[in-house]
UniProtKB/Swiss-Prot annotation:
Family: Belongs to the shikimate dehydrogenase family.
Reactions that this protein is recorded to catalyse: shikimate + NADP(+) = 3-dehydroshikimate + NADPH + H(+)
Pathway(s) where this gene product acts: Metabolic intermediate biosynthesis; chorismate biosynthesis; chorismate from D-erythrose 4-phosphate and phosphoenolpyruvate: step 4/7
Protein name: Shikimate dehydrogenase (NADP(+))
Superkingdom of origin organism: Bacteria
Taxonomic path: Bacteria, Pseudomonadati, Myxococcota, Myxococcia, Myxococcales
Active site as annotated: 70 (proton acceptor)
Sequence positions that bind shikimate: 19-21, 66, 91, 106, 224
Chain positions recorded as NADP(+) binding sites: 129-133, 222, 243
Keywords, ordered alphabetically: Amino-acid biosynthesis, Aromatic amino acid biosynthesis, NADP, Oxidoreductase
Quaternary data: Homodimer.
A Pfam family: SDH_C
Length: 279
């Protein structure tokens, strides 16, 4: 039961009703005996400043931020963590007295999972997209030492992202390069790792990305659910970092930032996989 003592958390996005974050975070709160609740908050882009300010005024303790607000919310933060500043996007807000502190747990989660799946320094990698999620993925790939090529429907966005992340490339590692969207298939064929940072797969009617996946390739998809890319990766025998794994890991990192407690990650993963949960 929600009372005047219940700590409030939520996720801002548009669309956001499909989000599995509420049941995942609710399971973690319940497991640790915390009096807290987490809700999905649909917010259209033009209402984002009012929503962020209103959530602070209403006493929310923390927020996640999802499509399409991850870049726009940066300007609404009182302070921004160095990683989020490098990424140029924020997906987690933590309350301070004066406002919100912004973090990017997408980026940290992606880096951890890519390393766990054996992404080697110097590996050629292809990223599809240049929006908020793609920025987190690009940061993770560069920090992991991959030789990154970025393809986006808007070539200027891919070029801008490549230029911004270039200074982060390690000694001896080539800076990221933007490539045409039309070269996606050929670039994927040459890559050891392929990451989808677009929203392709979010809607059932979405056409798949125009690329092939092969056995042993490392494939990561920021969209969760039975996406075309996830199916292709499983069918081909690729190493898959699914959207669910990214969701759970970033959610666990957000939980720790908000509460100062280690998140029950296995339980959170089980919560989003349970029958009857939102998809």
């Amino acid at each position: 039961m929600i009372t005047g003592r219940t700590a409030l958390y939520g996720v801002l996005g548009n669309p956001v009703r499909h989000s599995r974050s509420p049941q995942m975070q609710a399971a973690a709160f319940e497991h640790l005996g915390l009096d807290a609740t987490y809700v999905a908050l649909p917010v259209e882009p033009e209402r984002l400043p009012a929503a962020v300010a209103g959530a602070h005024a209403l006493g929310f303790q923390g927020l996640n931020v999802t499509v399409p607000h991850k870049r726009a919310v940066v300007a609404l933060c009182e302070a921004v963590d160095p990683v989020a500043r490098e990424v140029g996007a924020v997906n987690t807000l933590r309350r301070t007295e004066r406002g919100w502190e912004g973090f990017n747990t997408d980026a940290a989660a992606c880096l951890m999972l890519l390393r766990e799946e054996g992404l080697r320094p110097g590996a050629p990698a292809l990223l599809a997209g240049a929006g908020g999620a793609a920025r987190a993925a690009a940061w993770a790939l560069v920090r992991a030492g991959a030789v990154l090529r970025i393809a986006a429907r808007r070539q200027d966005a891919a070029e801008r992202l490549a230029a911004e992340l270039g200074p982060l490339a390690g000694p001896g590692t080539p800076a990221p390069v933007a490539v045409p969207w039309g070269a996606l298939e050929a670039e994927a064929d040459a890559a050891e790792a392929v990451v989808n940072g677009t929203t392709v797969g979010l809607h059932p009617e979405d056409a798949p990305l125009p690329l092939r996946v092969r056995a042993g390739q490392l494939v990561a998809d920021f969209v969760y659910g039975d996406t075309p890319l996830a199916r292709a990766a499983r069918d081909a025998g690729a190493r898959l970092v699914s959207g669910e794994r990214i969701l759970v890991r970033q959610g666990a990192l957000s939980f720790a930032l908000w509460t100062g407690r280690a998140a029950p990650e296995a339980l959170m993963a089980a919560a989003i996989a349970a029958p009857g949960r939102a998809t």
